[in-house]
Amino acid sequence: EQCQDMAGGAR
C-alpha cells in the first residue's frame, strides 16, 4: 500500500 503514502494515489 505505498500508493496511499506516496501521494494519496489510492484516494
UniProtKB/Swiss-Prot annotation:
One of its GO terms (cellular component) is extracellular region. It is found in: Secreted, Cell wall. Its main location: secreted. Keywords: Cell wall, Secreted. This is 33 kDa cell wall protein.
